[in-house]
C-alpha cells in the first residue's frame, strides 16, 4: 500500500492515467482518434502542431496500451528517481515529440497512408536516457545493440510497429542523457547513481 501511495505522487503515475483516460475517450468516441494521431504531409499540409504531442498519449489497441504502460511504469519509475519532475517531463515529452516528428517526416516520404500513435517513442527515449546516464560505459554499446535487435525482432510478431519512432526516441534519449551527464547532473542524480551501482553489485 505504501509503494502504491508513493507511486501516486510521481509523474509516471499521472502519465499512465492520461494514457488510460485517452484510450477510454477513444473507446467512447472512436472518431476522436482521427484528431490525435500523426499522419503525413500529403494529408496534413497545414501541419497541425498538436499532432506532434497527442500521439504520445494515444493507443488504438488494448494490447498496445498495456505493453506500453508496463514499460512506462518500470522505466519511468526508475528514471524519475534521479531527475526532478521538470527534467523527467522534458525527457519524456522531448523524446516523444522528436519521435513523432521523425515519424511524420518518414511517413510523408515512404508510407503515405500510415498513421503514428503510441507512447513507444517516449519510452524508448527513457531507455536511451537510462543507458547513457546509468549503464557503465563499457556495457553501453552491447546493451544498445540488444535493444535495437529486440526492437527490430518485435516486427516478426507484431505488425505495424513504428520503428522510426522507436529509433528516433532511443537515439534522442541517448543525446538527452549525454547532455544531462555533461551539463545538468546534480546531487539527487549522484546519490541515486551511487546507490544503484551498489544494488547492482550486490545482486551479482
Feature locations, PLM:
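A detector for small-residue-rich transmembrane helices and their helix-helix packing motifs
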Residues: 1-204
Amino acid at each position: 500500500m505504501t509503494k502504491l501511495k508513493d507511486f501516486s505522487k510521481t509523474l509516471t503515475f499521472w502519465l499512465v492515467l492520461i494514457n488510460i483516460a485517452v484510450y477510454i475517450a477513444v473507446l467512447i468516441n472512436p472518431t476522436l482518434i482521427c484528431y490525435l494521431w500523426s499522419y503525413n504531409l500529403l494529408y496534413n499540409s497545414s501541419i497541425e502542431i498538436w499532432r506532434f504531442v497527442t500521439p504520445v498519449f494515444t493507443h488504438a489497441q488494448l494490447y498496445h496500451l498495456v505493453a506500453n504502460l508496463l514499460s512506462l511504469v518500470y522505466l519511468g519509475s526508475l528514471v524519475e528517481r534521479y531527475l526532478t519532475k521538470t527534467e523527467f517531463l522534458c525527457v519524456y515529452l522531448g523524446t516523444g515529440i522528436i519521435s513523432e516528428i521523425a515519424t511524420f517526416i518518414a511517413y510523408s516520404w515512404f508510407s503515405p497512408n500510415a498513421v503514428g500513435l503510441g507512447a513507444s517513442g517516449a519510452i524508448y527515449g527513457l531507455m536511451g536516457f537510462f543507458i547513457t546516464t546509468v549503464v557503465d560505459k563499457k556495457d553501453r554499446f552491447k546493451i544498445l545493440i540488444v535493444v535495437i535487435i529486440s526492437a527490430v525482432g518485435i516486427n516478426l510478431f507484431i505488425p505495424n510497429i513504428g520503428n522510426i519512432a522507436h529509433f528516433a526516441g532511443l537515439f534522442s534519449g541517448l543525446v538527452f542523457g549525454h547532455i544531462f551527464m555533461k551539463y545538468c547532473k546534480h546531487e539527487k542524480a549522484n546519490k541515486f547513481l551511487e546507490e544503484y551501482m551498489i544494488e547492482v553489485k550486490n545482486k551479482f
